[in-house]
């Protein structure tokens, strides 16, 4: 009992000492600063900044047409014409009431950030705010016109962009400043629940997330995802699913047609991860052998993936409890997985990205446990847990005492499984467990420099274990890709997969300067591309229809023209041309990259691509699939009812304002950026290490083929792991923060 009282007193003292949070005011002082009486001049200045911010939201360059200006002033030219263009780009009275109301609402937070507190002009606020403003201005232009024309296409456009950028910068700097203050507060306070103040709500939340931290979240996730499973049974096809299954059965498929096969009799190849192809194909083969039905085999795979994905999400939530995260944070993470339709949709989608995402989630969770610093100099490296003591009569928590548990054999097994899954379910994915294990080992070795002899020994063992997982994973990957695959005649993937950026740049340059020779009727020919340059490009990409194949948002059509027989000399000649064209028109090359990836930083007006039952049915019915298999969706009344309900809910989330942001890649990318900046300014290197795998996923997206405006599949692993990383890094108690 005395130990419990000492623990409670220590906790209260820690709460009082951290009430202000690192760099933030106390709640009472913040409230006074928000609502105190400011000088009229400061309030007026804040209102003016709020008007500027709302003006940024209302600018629409398409309103300023030549006809509209002619009706006002037919003789307008020069500077006068530019002024008309700028003024007509504003919304006018059409949205005046809404924008005025928004400006009034924004006045209070802007006044508080500018005049009530210091720190608004710190680099950690100003730099991300400026980057956000630039992304909003240029992102809108690329989203609407596939170019920077709306942002810098003339003097009037530049003026409009400066106004819009200034407004977005005001919004962003205020928002980032307040967000960082919220991070400070959440890091110092636990939102507490009690039966007296919350009644049944407290009992339900406690039963859900405390008494059964894994089983109940797993049941909740499985139950809420079940309608999607029933609607999609036996599983959702996407573009690559049929090709992977045909590969396993050694049947013709799109990838084996263009590769130079090392064994013409073996059509299985490394365009898709061979391990995942074997898993999907093996399940289909099992269904045919046992049930005589390929759909039964597909259902086996879907159920397996569904179970693994739901279990990883539940394990993530349960681990947050063991790491000391509060009830509200854990409930929010669980609700995120339950209510965002992307997760249930992907859980039944037959694609490599889902199991790779599960591996990344598991890797992040295990990495967090290894990264935990010692609670005291004599503590062992491993997992921090809460020793919950309860009263049998009331079920109320008496005390929560921080204790330290060893990194168990089960934890090492999960770490190895996560590392192997990341390495084998994504081509090139071996870099993720390698980076995670090396970082974890480095921190364990650093912790081994202090503490008791036993603590140092445990830290060294943890470091050795992390390095052993890395070595085993890399060795297994190399043995599989360099020994087993050649021995079985399995051809590796193409070199073209890593060349999306230069290929897109070349195609855009050809469209802009030499479209007449690159497949565009009536295209340009300004003489900047000579015959030798065309020939050098043709030997690698095929020049005759290069510009016609160019899609600003997706590089697949351009990459598909890659000649697998191109020699090293051909590639060297091509990159020589690429460099000369870069120097000739660098803006074109920058636009090619911006156009292909702006959706990761700008909330596009386009709806993200959803893998629904309608598109799956079309893919199942394609001739190249129908020729060998009879895949089809279950057509029962319950399946149809679930399909309608799931589709309706998904559309609602996509279209309802604010909720629709959960279906935008840019929201998650900016969340990762801002959390990283916050940790960087606090110099929390240990916590930043946990975000390295997530940054790795984003980096892969930014050299990949697709735009985040319409494809979230490539970012899915980062989205899955982000809630866990954010809660562990920022919430009370901050286990990964240095003392």
Stretch-by-stretch model annotation:
Residues 300-324:
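Transmembrane-helix motifs of polytopic, lipid-linked glycan transferases
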Residues 78-101, 296-300, 595-694:
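Membrane-interface anchor segments at the N-terminal boundary of transmembrane helices
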Residues 231-238, 251-309:
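Membrane-proximal lumenal/periplasmic loop motifs of glycosylation machinery
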Residues 122-125, 129, 214-216, 316-339, ...:
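Transmembrane-helix signature of polytopic, membrane-embedded enzymes
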Residues 42-62, 128-141, 211-238, 471-483:
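Transmembrane signal-anchor helices characteristic of membrane glycosylation enzymes that use polyprenol
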Residues 487-637:
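Membrane-proximal stem/loop segments at transmembrane-domain junctions that anchor or position
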Residues 411-426, 472:
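Membrane-interface alpha helices of multi-pass inner-membrane proteins
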Residues 170, 174, 249, 355-378, ...:
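Specific aromatic-rich, kink-prone transmembrane helix
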């Amino acid at each position: 009992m005395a130990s419990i009282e000492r623990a409670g007193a220590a906790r209260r003292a820690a709460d009082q000492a951290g009430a202000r949070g690192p760099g933030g005011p106390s709640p009472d002082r913040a409230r006074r600063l928000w609502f105190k009486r400011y000088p009229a001049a400061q309030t007026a200045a804040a209102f003016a900044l709020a008007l500027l911010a709302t003006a940024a939201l209302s600018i629409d360059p398409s309103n300023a047409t030549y006809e509209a200006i002619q009706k006002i002033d037919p003789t307008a030219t020069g500077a006068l014409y530019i002024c008309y263009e700028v003024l007509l780009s504003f919304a006018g009275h059409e949205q005046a009431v809404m924008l005025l109301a928004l400006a009034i609402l924004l006045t209070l937070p802007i006044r508080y950030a500018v005049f009530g507190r210091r720190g608004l002009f710190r680099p950690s606020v100003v730099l991300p705010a400026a980057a956000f403003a630039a992304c909003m201005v240029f992102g809108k232009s690329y989203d609407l016109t596939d170019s920077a024309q709306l942002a810098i296409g003339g003097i009037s456009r530049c003026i409009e962009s400066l106004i819009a950028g200034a407004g977005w910068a005001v919004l962003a700097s205020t928002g980032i400043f307040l967000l960082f203050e919220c991070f400070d507060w959440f890091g110092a306070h636990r939102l507490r629940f009690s039966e007296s103040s919350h009644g049944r709500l407290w009992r339900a939340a406690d039963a859900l997330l405390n008494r059964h931290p894994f089983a109940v979240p797993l049941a909740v996730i499985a139950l809420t995802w079940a309608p999607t499973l029933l609607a999609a049974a036996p599983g959702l096809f996407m573009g690559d699913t049929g090709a992977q299954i045909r590969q396993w059965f050694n049947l013709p498929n799109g990838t084996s047609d263009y590769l130079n096969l090392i064994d013409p009799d073996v059509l299985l190849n490394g365009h898709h991860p061979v391990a995942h192809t074997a898993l999907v194909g093996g399940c289909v083969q099992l269904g045919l052998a046992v049930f005589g039905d390929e759909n039964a085999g597909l259902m086996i795979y879907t159920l397996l993936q569904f179970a693994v994905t739901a279990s990883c999400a539940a394990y993530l939530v349960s681990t947050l409890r063991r790491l000391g995260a509060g009830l509200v944070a854990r409930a929010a993470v669980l609700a995120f997985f339950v209510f965002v339709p992307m997760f249930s949709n992907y859980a039944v989608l037959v694609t490599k990205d889902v199991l790779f995402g599960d591996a990344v989630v598991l890797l992040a969770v295990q990495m967090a446990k290894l990264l935990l610093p010692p609670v005291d100099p004599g503590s062992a490296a491993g997992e921090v847990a809460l020793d919950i003591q309860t009263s049998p009569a009331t079920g109320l928590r008496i005390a929560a005492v921080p204790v330290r548990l060893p990194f168990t054999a089960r934890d090492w097994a999960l770490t190895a499984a996560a590392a192997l899954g990341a390495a084998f379910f994504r081509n090139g994915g071996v870099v993720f467990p390698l980076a995670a294990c090396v970082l974890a080992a480095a921190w364990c070795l650093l912790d081994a420099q202090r503490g008791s002899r036993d603590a140092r020994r445990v830290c060294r063992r943890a470091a050795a274990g992390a390095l052993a997982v890395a070595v085993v994973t890399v060795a297994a990957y190399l043995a599989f890709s360099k020994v087993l695959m050649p021995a079985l005649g399995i051809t590796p993937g193409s070199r073209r997969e890593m060349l999306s950026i230069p290929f897109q740049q070349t195609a855009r340059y050809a469209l802009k300067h030499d479209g007449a020779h690159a497949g565009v009727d009536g295209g340009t020919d300004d003489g900047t591309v000579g015959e030798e340059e065309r020939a050098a490009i043709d030997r690698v990409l095929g020049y005759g229809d290069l510009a016609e194949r160019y899609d600003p948002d997706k590089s697949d059509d351009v990459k598909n023209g890659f000649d697998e027989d191109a020699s090293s000399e051909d590639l060297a000649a091509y990159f020589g041309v690429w460099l000369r064209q870069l120097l000739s028109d660098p803006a074109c090359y920058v636009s090619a990259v911006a156009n292909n990836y702006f959706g990761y930083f700008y909330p596009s007006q386009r709806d993200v691509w959803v893998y629904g039952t309608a598109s799956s049915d079309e893919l199942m019915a394609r001739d190249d699939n129908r020729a060998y298999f009879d895949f089809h969706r279950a057509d029962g009344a319950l399946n149809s009812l679930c399909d309608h309900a799931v589709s309706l809910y998904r559309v609602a989330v996509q279209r309802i304002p604010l909720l629709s942001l959960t279906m935008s890649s840019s929201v998650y990318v900016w969340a990762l950026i801002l959390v990283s900046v916050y940790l960087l300014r606090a110099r929390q290197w240990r916590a930043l290490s946990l975000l390295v795998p997530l940054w790795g996923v984003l980096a892969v997206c930014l050299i990949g083929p697709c735009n985040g405006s319409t494809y979230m599949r490539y970012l899915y692993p980062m989205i899955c792991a982000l809630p866990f990383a954010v809660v562990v890094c920022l919430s009370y108690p901050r286990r990964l923060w240095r003392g």
